[in-house]
Amino acid sequence: MKVLIVGSGGREHAIAWSVSRSPNADKIYCAPGNAGIAEYAECVNIGAMEFEKLADFAQENQIDLTIIGMDDPLVGGIVDEFESRGLRVFGPRKN
């Protein structure tokens, strides 16, 4: 399973660590990530609020699940963007 984690803080670090322990996780990406997260995931230089670029990345890299860790993208509607493209995403919708 390919996983994309959106964010760059302590919450996303904990998520990356947890996902890395799963035998089902073949590849983990984090956007934008940080040096600590890079121990567990490949960091991608896409900002957490760049919804279209993140969704494009998920499609192009055949991401099986995207986990949204940061609050601002959730409030901004990132889950709605991913779902509108048929992408699997974990997080609440904007409305």
Regions found by a protein language model. Give the residues of each.
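ATP-binding N-terminal substructure of ATP-dependent carboxylate-amine bond-forming enzymes
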Residues: 1-95
